Amino acid sequence: MAKRIITISREFGSGGRFIGEEVAKKLGIAYYDKNIIGQIAEKSGLSPEYIQENAELSPKKGLFAYAFSGRDITGKSVEDMVYEAQRNIILELAEKEPCVIIGRNADYILKDRDDVLNVFIHVDMLEKIKRITGLYNVKEKEAVKMMADTDKRRRTNYNFYTDQNWGKASNYTLCLNSSQLGYDRCEMIIMECVK
């Protein structure tokens, strides 16, 4: 396998997590997503529940926000500690074994490696709303809010911790529209690209 590591960044509702999991199964490689939260918690000293709820947040900006945010004795925010633990774990996983890593700025964290395929999966708006209402059993209005909130958190976190813009095609090796291609074809394209 020319590319050992596959990172998948995705819009909420795009099916990126499902696609990544299927690719990992078909290639017989490890799959990392929410299952690394325990490792991040251990390294950062925070609870897994806190990591789960706050992993995509960014440090607050502004003097007032800085003054009232949680920081350690070195001045690092809690969000910075989580990000640093996450970064170190992703670097360790990439050294350890071939794998698929979902989100967590892994594309940026591993940008200096030649054996990484960075994928961004997006989806047409109507299809995204349809998927979210079906998966989460919510009304369309709630689906739109969930989508906007989740993608905003991802974008803000990514843009804060990297020198890049989340979702910008030039940051990725491959950008796929899952509503145009379907899950199966997205999986096939990714697997073809890692050969």
Q: Which residues does each predicted region cover?
A:
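Short beta-strand-centered segment that lines the nucleotide-binding/catalytic pocket of NTP-utilizing
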Residues: 30-41
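Pre-Walker A (Motif I) flank of P-loop NTPase domains
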Residues: 2-11, 97
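Domain-scale detector for complete catalytic domains at protein termini or as standalone homologs
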Residues: 1-6, 65-75, 83-84, 88-92, ...
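Small-molecule kinase domains that catalyze NTP-dependent phosphoryl transfer to phosphate-bearing small molecules
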Residues: 59-66, 139-184
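RNA pseudouridine synthases
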Residues: 93, 109-112
